[in-house]
A protein has these predicted regions:
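Intrinsically disordered, low-complexity acidic/polar segments
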Residues: 15, 54, 77-79
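Terminal, regulation- and interaction-focused segments at domain boundaries
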Residues: 1-34
Length: 98
């Protein structure tokens, strides 16, 4: 079960939603050193070093929503609320609200 689980409705085409999800993943890669890869309609990501070390997760895209599931290592759970707020802000910026 994910430590953080956020679903955001969208009114985009699936292809456009996938492009937006990739923008989100690239931002995590640039800022946190997270590695990511597409597996079907899902981006799987993890961090093996840096401030986000131990973080794993998935960004799933379907025709009506984008879902972000993040598993935080024990030490980062203390700032779960901050991380969740930042993910929501980034989703607002990249995907918007339907």
């Amino acid at each position: 079960m994910a430590t953080i689980d956020i679903r955001r409705a969208h009114a985009l085409s699936t292809d456009e939603a996938k492009k937006k999800a990739e923008t989100l993943a690239r931002g995590m890669e640039d800022k946190l050193g997270i590695k990511w890869r597409w597996e079907g309609d899902r981006i799987k990501f993890d961090a093996t070093s840096g401030a986000a070390k131990g973080v794993t997760g998935v960004v799933s895209v379907d025709p009506k929503s984008v879902r972000v599931e993040i598993d935080l290592p024990f030490l980062l759970r203390a700032i779960k609320g901050t991380i969740e707020s930042r993910v929501n802000e980034k989703l607002d910026e990249v995907i918007g609200r339907a």
